[in-house]
Every structure is written in C-alpha cells, then in structure tokens.
C-alpha cells in the first residue's frame, strides 16, 4: 500500500509554479509505440537535439494529432516530453501499462508532480503501471481514461504546462509525491 508523501501536496495546475529550466516550451520528444503501430509522421522523427522545437508549426500539429489518436487507441508504450533540448532534465514521462497511463513531471531536485485522485476508494493500492518500468505507482496517480490521458499529454506538449483538467500530487523537493 502506498500513501501520499508527508512532503507532498494536492494542488490544481494553476497552483504549481512549474520549474522548466531555460525554456518555457517542450524542446525534445521521444515516443515508443507498440510494434508495427507507429504513426506515419512519427516513423522518421529524429532522436536529436531540439527535435520537437525544430518542427514547423503545421508538422507539430499534425504529429500531435497522430499522438493523441495513438494514445486513445492504446498504441503508445511510453513518452518523454522535455524542456531540455537533449531531453535530459525537466521532463514529463508517461508509461502505459494495462490500460493505465502513469505520468510524472520531474524537475530534478525541484519538483515532482503526478495527476492525482486521492478520493478514489482504492487510491493507494498498486496500479501495476510502473514509471520507466521500475517505479511502482499508486492507483491515485494514474489515468485510466485514455482520452483524458491524451488531453493531459497534449496540453503539456502544446502549452508547456500541467493540465488544469486534473489535480496534481506535487513534491517541491523533487521526490516522488507518494511513498
């Protein structure tokens, strides 16, 4: 069983001053799709510095739409959206497992935030959806509605902010908001 960390707080997105490093918009994106299910525009997307920021606005919009559809239809395994040009710091990681999306914003030693529904009856049980394949997540901190997950992800991708559509468990020391 999990519980909310004593250092964590439940907040709305507008109550979180999101540390983003030097940039205010997503610079780097990597996506891992289910084998054989990579959307057309994503097939040749480079894994290089500032790969997302370098896209023409029309291409970014088309790729975001394909990403949204892939998330909704369960064709994405994981995502990494970073404010850092090389994808190393200040990032939103998303892992999909068993019909659940585990999202975690991490600004090393400054902030860690995950969507949170602490009032859910089984909130602090294991979601069996791990971040990075190794960090267990409580049910309170996963999204089970893939349409909502897609909206939260695209909001971050397009606005460089956490979505106001959900509450967030946040720890301003950079530790996980649950223990």
Region annotations inferred by a language model:
Residues 74-106:
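The feature represents the first ordered module of a protein
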Residues 1-73, 100, 104-179:
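Acidic, proline/glycine-rich low-complexity IDRs
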């Amino acid at each position: 069983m999990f519980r909310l960390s004593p250092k964590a707080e439940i907040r709305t997105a507008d109550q979180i001053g999101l540390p983003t490093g030097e940039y205010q918009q997503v610079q780097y994106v990597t996506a891992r799709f289910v084998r054989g299910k990579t959307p057309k525009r994503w097939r040749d997307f480079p894994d290089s510095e500032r790969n997302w920021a370098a896209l023409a606005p029309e291409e970014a919009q088309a790729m975001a739409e394909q990403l949204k559809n892939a998330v909704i239809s369960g064709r994405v395994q994981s995502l990494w959206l970073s404010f850092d040009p090389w994808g190393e710091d200040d990032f939103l990681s998303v892992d999909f497992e068993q019909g659940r999306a585990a999202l975690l914003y991490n600004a090393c030693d400054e902030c860690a935030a995950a969507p949170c529904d602490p009032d859910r009856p089984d909130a602090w049980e294991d979601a069996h959806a791990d971040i990075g394949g190794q960090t267990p997540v409580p049910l309170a901190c996963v999204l089970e509605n893939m349409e909502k997950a897609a909206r939260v992800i695209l909001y971050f991708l397009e606005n460089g902010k956490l979505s106001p559509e959900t509450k967030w468990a946040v720890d301003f020391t950079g530790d996980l908001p649950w223990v």
